[in-house]
Regions:
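C-terminal structured "cap/appendage" subdomains that terminate the fold
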Residues: 523-527, 531-552, 559-563, 567-569
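C-terminal outer-membrane beta-barrel translocator/porin domains of Gram-negative envelope proteins
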Residues: 232, 373-381, 385-510, 518-522, ...
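Extended hydrophobic-aromatic, low-complexity segments
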Residues: 191-192, 204-206, 239, 267-270, ...
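Periplasmic polypeptide-binding modules associated with outer-membrane biogenesis and secretion
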Residues: 21-34, 41-276, 285, 299-317, ...
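Gram-negative/organellar outer-membrane beta-barrel architecture
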Residues: 116-122, 219-410, 437, 474-478, ...
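Bacterial N-terminal signal peptides that target proteins for export
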Residues: 1-8
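N-terminal signal peptide c-region/cleavage motif recognized by signal peptidases
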Residues: 16-19
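Flexible, surface-exposed loop regions and adjacent strand-edge segments
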Residues: 113, 196-200, 276, 345-350, ...
Length: 577
């Protein structure tokens, strides 16, 4: 019987505790701003069902409040508890009334730097961030300062750095705090020899990817840049370049050792897609990321749709002096087109020299050869061309596959002359731009502009691929793909020698990865600028931020066109830049 009675009492006490927990709410009064925020963070570990009015719980709350205030320089708060009766429909409230008291203020910050830190501007700049005398003590400032000293050491190669002393002293009777730090950075390490293991590419090509010289001071950004460059070549499946510390303790010269593994020699990709401009499309690509020890690579692509069938290749030859940023590109292909009033068979071959600059700009000079047999409207021709050109471009973006910020710019000039065997003289100038900006995360703006100009004395001999047509996605929505250009006497499209199109689009993030869009496109494709014929289309659309890039659906109609009235829809997948 006594055992039964004890069990009953224990059960009653447990039930009573749960009843209190379920009927008591904690409330802290007297704090605001950073003090309130920090105390709330300390109390956030307390679950609502743990709140009770007993002495043990009050002591727990008292400790948490004091810890939160102490971190911000308030060492002597006054804390009083009061249990408020429940309202008509509610729970009892355990109130903690807090008076922070007088804060502890900085009385001095004594920081001694030894070793290379005495003359290193990054360390000297850190000294300027110390709190001024009289500032309220903040433990985070002290801890952050010490962490910053360590971060500079790791970033710049002071691998023997240490704290001889680091104390935060508090004199409560004077309400003052004192920093006392004695820090020795030691000697700064330098880069040593860089070696590689597992590479199928000649060592001299890899050495010319190293962005620093042996003997340069160590910096983590240089090591990261080396890893990035090796990965960016596309030659390797994995890249790890790491310091060999055990070989450098005495000399302070840090050798690096890179372990790489070759990328698969052959990759084949196939896909089926759809776009409104060309309809269903089958694509295949064969990629050889490296073909020999000189790092040559090959990409072959095939694309088949109802209006266009194309087979092309691109052979890349990196230059020894700068394999990543300077290279030759040999390109060629076959293309057949049967679209609107265009029928064409084209064979092309081009040799280009590229410079990919660290600023992000890409420059190229090229020499192209092409043989085109085509019918455009009522005119049939066979044209052989040999023409040089120059191109400069840059693409920047932030925010992943659906950038929140970015721009793409491309400018090119091509020149053909019968003096070296071309069938026609011409000059072609083109400029293409896209800008993306986002405001307040939910408002996205996309602007596009395209300009083109052909100067020639025999336009009929210019192949359709060099002529300008407008209409369709990324041009003037509301019109069919490449349906805007001057027409001949029979009403067939001829293509234009002048092009100007622009687009403004606003997108709003409706929810999650879904965006709504509204847009207006305008422009013209003409051969005589004195006979301006601007076309305008406007519409609405939906964007879905898929894992492989934005997928879009647009509906658009022509504006103010007496000959075109129909609704056009556009489906597309791919980058906007």
């Amino acid at each position: 019987v006594p055992q039964i009675r004890l069990i009953g009492i224990a059960t009653l006490l447990l039930a009573s505790g749960h009843a209190f927990a379920a009927n008591v709410r904690l409330q802290v009064e007297g704090l605001s701003g950073a003090l309130q925020k920090n105390v709330r963070a300390q109390l956030s570990t307390i679950e609502s069902d743990e709140v009770t009015p007993d002495r043990r719980f009050r002591a727990r709350v008292d400790d948490a409040i004091r810890d939160g205030l102490k971190a911000l320089g308030y060492y002597e708060p006054t804390i009083e508890f009061d249990l408020r009766p429940p309202p008509a429909k509610g729970r009892q409230v355990l109130i903690a009334r807090v008076s922070p008291g007088e804060p502890v203020r900085i009385g001095g910050t004594d920081v001694i730097l030894r070793g290379g830190a005495r003359t290193d501007h990054d360390y000297l700049d850190l000294l300027k961030t110390r709190p001024a005398t009289g500032t309220v003590l903040n433990h985070h400032d002290y801890d952050s300062f010490k962490k910053s000293l360590t971060n500079v050491a790791l970033r710049k190669g002071y691998f023997d750095s240490k704290f001889n002393k680091s104390q935060l002293g508090v004199a409560l009777d004077r309400h003052q705090a004192f920093w006392d730090i004695d820090y020795d950075s030691g000697t700064r390490y330098r880069f040593g020899e860089v070696t590689f293991e597992g590479s199928q590419i000649r060592d001299e090509y890899l050495q010319n990817l190293v962005p620093f010289k042996e003997g340069d001071y160590y910096q983590t950004k240089d090591l990261a840049e080396l890893n990035r460059r090796l990965s960016a070549t596309g030659w390797f499946n994995s890249v790890i370049v790491a310091p060999e510390f055990e070989k450098s303790r005495k000399t302070k010269v840090l050798p690096l050792h890179g372990v790489v593994s070759p990328r698969t020699e052959n990759t084949i990709e196939t896909g089926v897609g759809y776009s409104t401009d060309v309809g269903p499309r089958v694509k295949a690509s064969w990629k050889k990321p490296w073909m020999n020890s000189y790092g040559h690579s090959l990409i072959t692509n095939a694309s088949i749709s109802a209006p266009e069938q194309q087979l092309d290749f691109s052979y890349k030859v990196p230059l020894l002096k700068n394999p990543l940023e300077q290279y030759y590109l040999v390109q060629g292909g076959l293309k057949r087109t049967d679209l609107n009033d265009t029928e064409a068979d084209s064979t092309t071959l081009a040799v280009s020299r590229y410079w990919d600059l660290s600023s992000g700009w890409q420059r190229a000079i090229n020499l192209r050869w092409s043989l085109d047999h085509f019918t455009q409207g009522n005119v049939t021709n066979t044209t052989m061309l040999l023409y040089p050109g120059v191109m400069i471009s840059r693409t920047r973006s932030r925010g992943g596959l659906m950038p929140t910020w970015g721009d793409s710019q491309r400018y090119s000039i091509d020149y053909s002359n019968t003096a070296w065997g071309s069938d026609v003289d011409f000059s072609v100038l083109q400029a293409q731009n896209v800008w993306i900006r986002t405001l307040a995360d939910r408002h996205r703006f996309v602007a596009r502009g395209n300009l083109g100009w052909i100067e020639t004395g025999d336009f009929d001999k210019v192949p359709p691929d060099l002529r300008f047509f407008a209409g369709g996605d990324r041009s003037i929505r509301g019109y069919k793909y490449k349906s805007i250009s001057p027409k001949d006497d029979d009403g067939k499209l001829k293509g234009a020698s002048k092009l100007a199109t622009g687009s403004l689009e606003y997108q709003y993030n409706v929810t999650g990865k879904w965006w709504g869009a509204t847009f207006i496109d305008s422009g013209e494709a003409v051969s005589d600028i004195r006979r301006s014929d601007f076309k305008t289309g406007a519409g609405v659309g939906v964007r879905w931020q898929s894992p492989v890039g934005p997928i879009k659906l647009d509906l658009a109609v022509p504006i103010g066109d007496k000959d075109e009235h129909g609704l056009q829809f556009y489906i597309g997948l791919g980058p906007e830049l």
